[in-house]
Amino acid sequence: MSKRSWWAGSRKPPREMLKLSGSDSSQSMNGLEVAPPGLITNFSLATAEQCGQETPLENMLFASFYLLDFILALVGNTLALWLFIRDHKSGTPANVFLMHLAVADLSCVLVLPTRLVYHFSGNHWPFGEIACRLTGFLFYLNMYASIYFLTCISADRFLAIVHPVKSLKLRRPLYAHLACAFLWVVVAVAMAPLLVSPQTVQTNHTVVCLQLYREKASHHALVSLAVAFTFPFITTVTCYLLIIRSLRQGLRVEKRLKTKAVRMIAIVLAIFLVCFVPYHVNRSVYVLHYRSHGASCATQRILALANRITSCLTSLNGALDPIMYFFVAEKFRHALCNLLCGKRLKGPPPSFEGKTNESSLSAKSEL
């Protein structure tokens, strides 16, 4: 049987039903305990073994990537969260969204060491069934929570710049906290099936941790892609296009603030394009492929490798978000430089959000 990668990107056809847990399994075949035959797809174990193996070089590269990602993301998001909490008195919507974004990143960063061990061990999962489920749950929780928090930041910027006066009552810290709480609940409930479905299989002395959607090869998977990614992505792009159009139409905003607005747009969209778009495009192709069947071994190998690479890019989000904080949140940048350099930067007192008024169009906010 293939020792294929466990994380969400390197999924096989719906074989998450396969499970080896001692006496819990109902059958045994060639040393592999499996679930009842009705739960297994027509993709044979032999085909998976031939087409989906990872090489030692791939394991080393993936492990090295996750090690670097873990260090950068842990340091960056821990520092960011500390600064945001310390500055909680600012009470701005953007501060609230950024703080929750840092929490989402940390929820995934803390389980990255399990991936390191998995790859350094040659695709062997030594942590057990529960840890396997929890790792996949936190992976998806971080990814989709991050996507929606970035969308909230985009919508908040749109209201602050394009409708500064009309949005005063709507853009309140309390509403931002409620929106974040709602998103946490929705994403956690959506990912909850990963906590209750079997996720490990064993062949000989090697345990593989699989993280799959049960509906991976069904219409439900495509609906999930549309709701969980396409909608927030289109919303984010639309908000920023409207912001750019308003700035180009001559709104009374200082040149410096216009530059900051454009910079934030570029960084957020870059995070989407680098971290999330490749993964979801590849996953769409993967879902459609396993609905059609009949692909060659070479095609299956390419799809599996693409899944692993795009999953790495998704995890990179945790390391890129602190860079976004540094370039788009002036107060974060000043606080970080003061902390690291031991001296204050020159310039006006920084703030995540200034006062909103009709002449400035609230452009002095979190940009």
From Swiss-Prot:
It is found in: Cell membrane. Expressed in brain, kidney, heart and umbilical vein endothelial cells. Highest level in brain. Residues 86-92, 155-175, 245-260, 330-367 are cytoplasmic. The chain crosses the membrane at residues 65-85, 93-113, 134-154, 176-196, 224-244, 261-281, 309-329. GO terms for cellular component: plasma membrane. Glycans are attached at N42, N204, N282. Disulfide bonds join C132-C209. It is a multi-pass membrane protein. Pfam families: 7tm_1 (PF00001). Keywords: Cell membrane, Disulfide bond, G-protein coupled receptor, Glycoprotein, Membrane, Receptor, Transducer, Transmembrane, Transmembrane helix. Residues 1-28 are annotated as: Disordered. The keyword rRNA-binding does not apply. It comes from the Eukaryota. Residues 1-64, 114-133, 197-223, 282-308 are extracellular. GO terms for molecular function: chemokine receptor activity; G protein-coupled receptor activity; receptor serine/threonine kinase binding. Dual specificity receptor for uracil nucleotides and cysteinyl leukotrienes (CysLTs). Signals through G(i) and inhibition of adenylyl cyclase. May mediate brain damage by nucleotides and CysLTs following ischemia. This is Uracil nucleotide/cysteinyl leukotriene receptor.
